[in-house]
Amino acid sequence: MIPRLLTEQVQRSAAWFPIVSVTGPRQSGKSTLVQHAFPDYAYLNLENPELRNQANVDPISFIRDRSTHLIIDEAQYAPDLFSMLQVVSDETKQPGQFILSGSQNFLLLRQIKQSLAGRAGVLKLLPLSYTEALAAQPELTIEEFMLTGGYPHLHDAHVPRSIFFESYVNSYIERDVADYLDVRNLTMFRTFLRLCAQHVGGLIKETTFANELGTTYRTVKSWMSILESSYITFSLPPYYGNLNKRLTKTPKLYFHDTGLLCHLLRINTVQDLQEHPLFGEIIENLVISETVKRYYNALKTPELYFYRDDSKIEVDLVDCTHSQTEPELIEIKSGRMYHDRFAKHLRSISTLLNVPDDNRTVATRVDRSYTDHDVNVRSIRDLLLQTEEPVA
């Protein structure tokens, strides 16, 4: 097993909550993580038809006849089980009684909100971070990581990426989207998924998507929500603050995994990647998605934004996670050299927001990080390897 940064945080959460749920995209390593983190717990996988039937027919006996130290995988397959978990956890009032995970996050989280609110700690396990992937492949470059992505099976079993991602997309569309989310036009949804990849790093304009697909605004809005709830994509909202300026109000679109993004863009080699017209947007996606992982792995909620105003002043990432009053401003560039002009917008916005010099960063593919007058020039590799202190 590739060591996961979230392992210790899952174990800590089990000391705080009677129930811990690990969510995340398909095949991000949830089952492996919880079994590794809690080796003494009984493991039940409701993919097993017999166990699933028991849990649905008689949830009381399913729980009462077993130890209270249980891992229940694919728990969403037994919705009536959640009320029983609530009863037992309220009776015993002991932390760490049940560990839940599942691949249909929208169903799992719905049940948790309905029956286990306040009783369950919910953690998000995304695909491997660059730091975690290096544990399996120490010579992995950031370009190779962008192309491969972070799904563990690609790094420990060395499955060919084209085979893995084709299977992944098919499973996602045929099982999650078709079976559980009542999407009827799967061919159009597949086209929609590729269209999202082609608009990575751009503003989410549902009307434009609807026109390109020949469908309705409401359908596109619903499908965007599906992609986010299943951890395929996420939106980066614009920064507002208390500025007396006209600011963009539309969020930007990014993918949680650049390997899947590259697959959808039909990028098959590092050379293809570096020559692709969206290379800059993919690097931008990498830095932002890795920042999201870093915070989730430390049990922190990312407060990330971008800035754009009507004067065409824009900064790729405004990180308010540590401070609302002094956010970190990060401009992301795909080149291998730093030029002072890269920092022009950083300086403009720093003045508006009263951001100190230490919080201005240009991230690019330079070999080493350094300071240039009032700007931090960070190697993207160094930025990706940055650590985050977990919640105390």
Language-model features: where?
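N-terminal pre-Walker A segment at the start of P-loop NTPase domains
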Residues: 1-11
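Hydrophobic anchor at the beta1->P-loop junction of P-loop NTPases
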Residues: 22
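Conserved catalytic/switch belt of AAA+ P-loop NTPases
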Residues: 82-100, 114
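Short regulatory helix/loop adjacent to the ATP-binding pocket of P-loop NTPases
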Residues: 106-121, 138
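Domain-level recognition of nuclease-like catalytic cores that cleave nucleotide substrates
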Residues: 127, 137, 365-392
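Accessory nucleic acid-recognition modules appended to NTPase machines
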Residues: 159, 163-327
